[in-house]
């Protein structure tokens, strides 16, 4: 948890992040009552209308995704971030998703994929090349870590609140592991979802919407988006391999082809040639979805 900059489910973290998000004008649950030593809280109920569920029931997804992007943009425009966020359970530090944490996440791929695919053999030379390939990406991720990232921002952690307005229609939950990170982090979590297919044209529209709202350098942000998305997809594949191989949860195999599709596509983007060459050399096509 320390390397990954995780909160270990501490209720103080949830309460402090919730207060910060509400202060930024976003919809995070009100903390009605809190027992920090007991790890318990009574919080506002946003209902059951998860984005994934309402889209499945026929709600047009473009307005929902654009609202979710607006919520990200609102968070990114919320001003200077405190090193320690005050909250009803006490202060909680806003840690940086730095190069060590990013590399530690990526390393789950080389640690766990061979447990699931015995044909993979990552010896010392391969591991050294792995770290060298990702080093520019992790350095970039740390250097540009200047906004709060929800960190698990996807259609099953967002609740549709249609009676509210603008970005406040997006109810946020499961944000206790928020960190200081690159602005693209939550964007790729939302638009290259491990759990559901987001149409490429919707991904493109949503990214353009963010670029328009934030007035950023599109070329630089697209490059960073592909690089950090690729790293996170390698991490997620490692997590899924661990869930299957160690924890006996075979259902997670079903998510792996989607992650491979995203990763393979990102590896073809500019700036990832060294990482792509590593995968071409060390991971056979039969494993890569």
Task: Describe the predicted segments one by one.
Residues 75, 134-187, 197:
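Active-site acidic catalytic loop and adjacent metal/ATP-binding pocket
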Residues 61-68, 102, 127-130, 230, ...:
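Hydrophobic packing residues in well-ordered alpha-helices of helical domains and bundles
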Residues 101, 109, 145, 150, ...:
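Secondary-structure capping and boundary motifs in well-ordered enzyme cores
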Residues 1-104, 108, 115, 119, ...:
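ATP-binding pocket architecture of kinase catalytic cores
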Residues 113-128:
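Conserved P-loop NTPase mechanochemical-coupling segment
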Residues 96-97, 218-229:
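All-alpha amphipathic helical-bundle segments outside canonical DNA-binding/catalytic cores
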Residues 107-117, 180-217, 230-247, 258-267:
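Active-site activation/catalytic loop segments of kinase-like enzymes and analogous catalytic loops
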Residues 9, 250, 254-289:
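Regulatory N- and C-terminal appendages and interdomain linkers associated
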